[in-house]
């Protein structure tokens, strides 16, 4: 028998049996929706400008109309950048966490905006370990017995946009941040691959980010947040998988 009444009962029974796994729906606020709009606009303008610049480099003589289009996109991109920064600084809902996030080395204002949108201002995700998995910063093992083994790899179903932003930040840290540059040099001497090093730095960055949000405290170089033991153990485990 299949009726609306029977279906409703089955759904209710299923929900009751699995109530420990229920995640309440968390709708996007107006601030998050506006930030998402300007972030998408920023990315669209950036990609369009990049395409035209690449096109111009393949020409001996750049047409005036093409250069004009590049200049217009550059100006639009500047205005969009300004709008995103204003939202992060002045919006009552976003400003506090945005300030904390941007204090972490490797987290730019664009990365901050993207993570605020993706986590819905750190309400959709509150745990660095889970978010690292969501963004493809956690290697997964694939083995069975003694005959099946693949090198640990990150999930292809991850949020690649956030992953790419974290990668950009990690590469920048390896060049400009003394602590991370020394860390990268040490790992290279140990024979670690560049991908492994970048992934470890992405993980470190995310754990620092969620720590400052959790503790409501600006990141300080010489301050070590008291991470929960399970978070610390998981980070060590993640690093060990890639090493």
Residue ranges of each PLM-predicted region?
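Non-catalytic alpha-helical coupling and interface elements of nucleotide-dependent molecular machines
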Residues: 16-20, 50, 54, 136-140, ...
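Phosphate-backbone recognition surface of nucleic-acid-processing proteins
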Residues: 103, 109, 114-190, 194, ...
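Long, charge-rich intrinsically disordered scaffolds of nucleic-acid metabolism proteins
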Residues: 1-104
